[in-house]
Amino acid sequence: MKFGKRLKKQVEESLPEWRDKFLAYKRLKKLVRLVSSSSGDVGGGGGGEAEFVRLLDGEVDRINAFFLEQEEEFVIRQRELQETVEKVAGGGGGGRRPAAAEMRRVRKEIVDLHGEMVLLLNYSAVNYTGLAKILKKYDKRTGRLLRLPFIEKVLRQPFFTTELISRLVRDCEATMEAIFTSSVATTAMAGDRRTWKGCSGDAGMAPMADQQGIFRNTVAALATMKELRSGSSTYGRFSLPPMAAPASPESDVLQSIRSDPHLKENGRIPSLQFFYA
């Protein structure tokens, strides 16, 4: 699949409020097409190249701003969620068992946060790859060597530095594993399974229709990151994002969510519908 189509697919599968935050690849590609390798202006490194670099710099600044904003939000949410998990696990300090609704809410928040952080890792990977691809096209068309110095600059950009988000994802997965398998959670949810099985019609289907998207998008993002890092012969040494790979779509933590017995209804496993009930 060509990168332009892959990017379009990723934008469509991303969160609605993120869709205008991705690299303006189509606009950059259009500008590259207007550039002629025989143009004295561009060949001399004049206005044509300056315009292209200005657009690239603007895109990098925009991507950085969004990435840093989301990263800061996730740090805060992760800290608050950990405090909530500890409170629920301890029965709020009063020795009581957490209610099923309370445990569902915590599970939902964990899954949402994990999914959104994986989407941010994917956002970094896709935008980095887009920059590398468009610079490769530019150099090929103009005969210039802009890609190497520009990518070296990109390597120092905040959106390219994903160690913090990768660590938050791993921490979140550890919390997910603990909360999904704890005896406290199992006890809290046991009675609620009977209530869930009694749901039918619109009341039973609404949670699935409203909330299953985050899990689907997360798995799609993981698959894309795996593809981008697969070492395709069309990619150069700068084309792979240097991130610590999060869980794969087949990872234990994601499979444990999908295979949770609470999710099984009429022989199928609706994505996360129980946790969003």
Swiss-Prot record:
One Pfam family from the UniProt entry?
Answer: SPX
Q: Which domain of life is it from?
A: Eukaryota
Phenotype reported upon loss of the gene: No visible phenotype, due to the redundancy with SPX5.
Q: In which tissues is it expressed?
A: Predominantly expressed in roots, leaves and seeds. Expressed in root epidermis, exodermis, sclerenchymal layer, cortex and endosperm. Under Pi starvation, also detected in mesophyll and phloem in the vascular bundles.
Looking at the record, the residues that make up the SPX domain are: 1-152
List GO terms (cellular component aspect).
Answer: cytoplasm; nucleus
The free-text function statement in the UniProt record for this protein reads: Functional repressor of PHR2. Involved in maintaining cellular Pi homeostasis when plants are exposed to an external change in Pi. Negatively regulates root-to-shoot Pi translocation redundantly with SPX3. Down-regulates the non-coding RNA IPS1 (At3g09922) and suppresses the responses of miR399 and PHO2 to Pi-starvation.
Q: What is this protein called?
A: SPX domain-containing protein 3
Q: Which organism is it from?
A: Oryza sativa subsp. japonica
Gene symbol here is SPX3
